[in-house]
Structure formats: structure tokens, C-alpha cells
Amino acid sequence: MFWFIVILRYNKNSSRKTKIVIYSGEMNMDKDPFKEYLRESEPNKATKGYVWSTAVGLQAVDGLKPSQYLIDTAIQNIEGKITLKEAQSLIESYYNERPVRVSDNERTEEADKVSSRIAELLSETAFSFSPNEYIAIHRKLFRGIYKHAGKIRDYNITKKEWVLDGATVVYGSASELRATLEYDFSQEKDFSYKGLSIEESIHHLALF
């Protein structure tokens, strides 16, 4: 099944919605370890199930697969046996104590740590739609994993994307990234979603 994840903040005092993140990819829902919790009648469990399912799904977009330890720890959190902070602490300790690291190709440690951090971000209510928040989210997700976490690149890049059948994407000039971010965010803040269908909203977000 091909899926989009669109997470929006709604401003109760206006018709605007503020985008946090949009991703697309493929996921076999029959293999989703949190599937049973998505049907839970208990709101808290259902919400946690969606949070963890989304976090793991976003890793799958980059071809990353979390460990069974992460899945088991997440389920403990969903069932209320441990808090999210305790779940994160267990994940951090798990890798601090491991004598053998997985290969770079598997990148399981990255998948586990980033999944738990995404789950935390999706559970928070505080949010500011700004370039600084955008950069802060990157820092929070990838701290200790990548040296450039939370930093705007200072060099130009190109990248082949599997979602585009290997086509090469040329990214914006490094010298203009900050100005480009400021402009794009200001344009989005002024955009009104009033009267748009879900499909039209997703189309606009994808272009943004």
C-alpha cells in the first residue's frame, strides 16, 4: 500500500493549517507491529499506537528497519507499562551497553533512536511554524547520530532518489538556504486552506 503521512496543526482561530511534516512511501500494513493498537477503543492506547506506527513508518521511507527490541519497548509504552521517557532511556542504554555494533548497512541503531525521538515529537503539543523550529527538529532527531544534526549545510549537493526511480535531484544553493527557508515559511503562513479538499491540501503541502 502506498501511503502519505501528513501531520497538521490547526489554528482554532483561523482557517489555516500549519504543516509539520509530509512523507510518502510504501508499507505493508499486515506487517505493522502496532496494527492491533490502531483499532483500540481506549483513546490513549490508540494514540500511542498511531504515534509509534508513524515513527517506524517514517524510517521505512529511508529503508531503515527498527530492531525487535525497539518494537517490544514501544509496545510496553503503548500498554502503559512504561512512560515514553523511560522507553527512550531503555533504547539509549541498550546501545550504550552493546559490545557489538550492527553494520552500517543495517543502521538499526539510527532507526531505533530516531523512531523513539519521532514518537516524542508527535506526542508534544508545543510547536512553532518557523525555520528555527524546523532546524531544531532535525537537531533533536539526529543528535549523536550525524555531526551535521541541526545545521544548515554549507556546500552544494545532488542526490539520486529511489522514490523517483533513481533520478537525480539538485538541491538549493547552500548560500541561499536560510533565505529560501524564511521565504518558503512566510509564504506558507499566508496561505489559506479554507475550502480546500483533503486531496487539494495534500497537493499543496507536497509542492511546499
Regions found by a protein language model. Give the residues of each.
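FIC/Doc superfamily catalytic core
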Residues: 2-208
